[in-house]
Amino acid sequence: KSDINFKGDNYNFTIHNVSAQDRQTAFTLDKYLNPSSMTIPQYNFRVGYFVKDNIDISFGIDHMKYVLEQDQLSRISGFIENSGTVYDGVYDNTLLPISDGFLQYEHSDGLNYINFEIRKHNMFLEQNNIKFSSITGLGLGFMLPKTNAKLLTNDRNDNFYLSGYGVHALMGLNVNLFKNFFVQTEFKGGYTSLPAIRTTANKSDTASQNFF
């Protein structure tokens, strides 16, 4: 959950503690393996180099989907004027549903996290040509989303843009099989700050939010 502030020529309001989720895409070979469809599901891409036997540095892209839940009841503070809608008014922690006519807000064309990492690998078990290693790491980068937002009667922005930054930590497990193959799983968590979100085709319309 997070607070999201929306600001423009005729409005400045914050919706408080609103819920969002990612968007999972059902697995099909076409959606996940066809290069022309690669941006439909969420994905991670990473390339790196071992500077020491157990230390690597890498560059990656995390293509995520962020979708604000519709029809949830939110508290709103601020004002909206001259929109020509029923939402004009002054709000003071007022309960208001996030309906389609008011707001649709998604980074569903990509909440793209362009990041750099450093990782340490620690082998803790080797048996019968199988090696088990733990992975820990830290990273940082910038956010390059394409936001699909519909705010009141405004046309949406349809461009990629720089919106903020992220920092993260990770841990994982690597199982190396006969030197040439491996299976790896990871858990990554972090903090994202988005102070410059483009919401509509008008450059004066912006939003900001932070979340873990």
Residue ranges with predicted function:
Residues 3-9, 70-76, 145-155, 196-203:
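Outer-membrane beta-barrel translocator domains and adjoining extracellular loop/strand segments
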Residues 4-5, 11-14, 19-21, 172, ...:
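Predominantly the C-terminal beta-signal and adjacent terminal strand-loop region
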Residues 45, 116-118, 167-171, 187:
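Membrane-embedded beta-strands of outer-membrane beta-barrel proteins
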